[in-house]
């Protein structure tokens, strides 16, 4: 019996040693645009039914959280989600007739510059939204989008999108790519629909919340520093002797 106990102890020690594995470098999923405890509800179908129209926008602040739609780490965007209100039949017809057609939106990545200027660096495909009114829908990107820490993940709406929560606290605000003096011109087309466009998100709208977010996979973190290149002063290794001829 004592011999068996010693054998089992040795086996356990051997097994435990075998389970000591190297550290793993994993990527992680992250949500851009989500705030814990914040579940905004779009305004539609209440009256007035307010929607985002013909612009590109991003959330600037939610309570004490700032920034909101900014990429936290280098990685790749893989999907985006949007919570949509459910406009009534007459409300939907009004938007379709006056804002260029059926509700639609796409994800847009902005590289921020100075004084609220941004450059469009990437975009996803335009998605039709009307089939998903009254729900939260997630769209996978056909091709993931590489992003850098500090980039802004915005929503471009070429027509309209019932994805706007109103009557929020005064500490909540979002920005749109409308110019100075044009913040109340909701009919003018200011949606950014071309990569490399330079735009300015001048207009700030308080007490309102955009109801979209994006999902990203962060780059894996290295578990060891990169190997240093050998110094020029390091001694050269001796070459092996040449084979001797018989």
Which residues are covered by each model-predicted region?
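Bacterial N-terminal signal peptides
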Residues: 12-22
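Short beta-strands within extracellular/lumenal beta-sheet-rich domains
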Residues: 53-72, 136-139
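N-terminal export and membrane-targeting signals
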Residues: 1-14
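Sec/Tat signal peptide C-region and signal peptidase I cleavage site
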Residues: 23-27
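PGST-rich, cysteine-poor low-complexity/disordered linker and tail segments that act as flexible spacers
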Residues: 97-112, 172-246
